Amino acid sequence: MATPPHEPDNQDHDPDIEDGAAAVEEAAQLLQSWTHGDLRFDDNIVSCKFVRTDEGRLVAAVMVAALHTADTVLMIPDEHAPVLELLLTMEPFDENGPDGRWVDRWRIYHGEEDDINWVFLDIDMGRMSGIIIDGDALMVANVLAQEEAGLCRAINELGTTALQRLCRNRLDKDVEAPLVVGVDPGGLDVRAKFDVLRIPFPMPMELPEDIVRITKDWAAPAKG
């Protein structure tokens, strides 16, 4: 009697696929937690501050020389993880046109820009730990985009003292004048004096009321 063909079940798995999926998730989370990196083009390496659009595209102000090269790489360093390298395509835009709101977002995060050439940075490909990652998998849309402004306002209304406790409790940092400037399911972006800090959530959160609740808990005075 012939042995019937093996039917795959939920316990079957492909280690290569699992490793690839884990690498994509790790890279996406790493990128989400940073708002600056090193931009490499031709023989230049310059600091690059960026923000994300609602659809997950990156936005930055770059020097004019960066616009005239076909090989542009953004490197996201992290002391606790491998470097993430992103191969980019730049798309210039006019800050006085319909996309000017992303310039406003950039300035809320970073202040005044050093360069005046505004571009979208589309990710063609990523690489981390030797694994190649499709760029589309790294441009993650913010499902809280419509609620983001209201969430920032609600959290900032807790007051400076509460936000200082939040940063101290979650990041072990003393921040003089913290301000929440961004919210997505992965965490909060908090502007400090010289940097933008990331306060991650313990798990992805998509309900605004849950985000406000957990933030209030983190920012509450110590009991007793």
Predicted regions and their residues:
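Binding-site signature for planar aromatic cofactors or substrates
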Residues: M1-G224
